[in-house]
Regions:
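N-terminal hydrophobic targeting signals that begin at the initiator methionine
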Residues: 1-2
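N-terminal capping segments
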Residues: 5-100
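...with weaker cross-activation on analogous glycine-rich loops/strands in unrelated enzymes
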Residues: 19, 77-146
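Glycine-rich catalytic cores of cysteine/serine-nucleophile enzymes that process amide/ester linkages
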Residues: 32-51, 72-73, 77, 118-159
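Short regulatory "switch" loops immediately downstream of catalytic or recognition motifs
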Residues: 67, 119, 163
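Short, low-complexity, Pro/Ser/Thr/Gly-rich segments in the mature regions of secreted, periplasmic
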Residues: 103, 108, 152-165
Length: 165
């Protein structure tokens, strides 16, 4: 399993590629839908006209040729944690634990391609996540589609993840 994780680290892509992938996802007509649905494995997805904030992350990685559904499932299996192929990759704490395992945490300045984990309403608030774009905005889905309509500081930043260069 360690070999799998190390290999994934080498194949991860660049922050600029992630920013570009996220920007390509702009679609204000994506309907917010957090309901667990059966999806194909590996690399399945709910219908592209539906999604939540985590689906922005998963879809951007998929554009770069990465399957977070499979990677997070395998990561959780390697840790002896319960798994659900339809939903694990669509939960912020699971994404965060996986990104931290790849040494992606960063608490410095923001750059395009950074993955921002917010706490809406303050430090104990609701989880939300998005990807920093070149224009200083963040691609996310908070219920108004997959759009870049917020600045990073609009919400309480909990963690920042950056792909290794």
């Amino acid at each position: 399993m360690l070999t799998f994780i190390l290999l994934q680290t080498l194949l991860i892509g660049t922050p600029q590629e992630l920013s570009s992938a996220a920007e390509s996802l702009h679609n204000p007509y994506v309907v917010y839908n957090a309901i667990e649905q059966p999806i194909d494995y590996p690399c399945g997805d709910i219908p592209s006209d539906q999604g939540v904030c985590t689906d922005v992350i998963v879809r951007a990685f998929k554009i770069m040729g990465r399957c977070l559904q499979e990677e997070i499932h395998e990561y959780r299996l390697s840790k002896g944690e319960s798994t659900g192929k339809n939903i694990d990759h669509r939960r912020i704490p699971n994404l965060a634990a996986y990104f931290a395992s790849l040494n992606m945490e960063s608490h410095e300045y923001l750059e395009p391609g950074d993955i921002i984990w917010w706490k809406l309403g303050g430090a104990d608030g609701i989880n939300h996540i998005g990807i920093m774009l070149d224009n200083g905005m963040v691609m996310h889905n908070i219920g108004r589609g997959q759009v870049a309509d917020v600045c990073p500081e609009d919400y309480h930043i909990h963690r920042i993840y950056r792909l290794p260069e």
